[in-house]
Amino acid sequence: MAATSLGPGAGTVGGNDPAKAIRLIVNADDFGISESANRAIERAHREGILTSASLMVAGDAADEAVRIARANPLLGVGLHLVLVCGRAVLPGHRIPGLVDAAGRFTDNPVLAGLRYFFLPGLRAQVRDEVLAQFEAFQATALPLDHVNGHLNFHLHPGVFRVLLDEAGRLGVRSVRLTRDPLIQNLRLAFGEYLYRVSHAAVFGALSRRSRPLLAQRGLRHAGATYGLLQNSRVTEDYLLRLLPELQPGTWELYCHADEGAHRHELEALLSPRVREVLEARGIRSCRYSDCL
């Protein structure tokens, strides 16, 4: 594959002029984290606009998530790498520098990021855990639609290097490039300005670093990734503001659909008003695998 971006004019299809098509990957992260999230994801896919989900292979409800995925073959399922705020696949004695006595990663993403970057002794452990999570995904026999990370940790240089080195062997073809345009987001939503500016800066820098490396490996990514700066506030109102602004190309929107704390995101995915805008604009909902 020579092309890398699924952005404007790259590999789009639809209508009489593929270069003018608007395609939207609608993804739910944290598939398998809980039964509540699993139910929301299945409902959003069957009744709403959700096209894909990212599986936490060590999540408390991962087995149920796999059953749901098998029962819904049009749901694109990717691997949601977890290296912070979650449980590891490998036993603690294999990765003692990464997990506590209960086999869980730290809940402090800043601390984790600094340790993974500045402690060379942890790099082999990070690599082993990443590969173990890929092996766990492969054991499900589900097609790998894409790869991303919990809290977008897949763009951390230490994790990203493993992805690049092993992409061919592991069957990775599409990776989330987490770049949510700040100026556009400030126009579309309100509040949490410190969070939005800081995350735009951090992930903007990581995306700029990662983009040419993805290109070198022929790995695909969307033109932009919406949802990062919303911090689990992907609401109906936000989508009704965002969708009219989408330009030709392929874009990703991600959320954390759930029946509990994030029910507003489930409701946004089920919204008839949102579907009406999608249809009125001719926006095609798709999976990463549809864009290759």
Task: State where each predicted segment sits.
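Residue-level signal for short amphipathic helical patches enriched in basic/charged
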Residues: 154
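Terminal accessory/targeting
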Residues: 2-26, 31, 35-146, 157-292
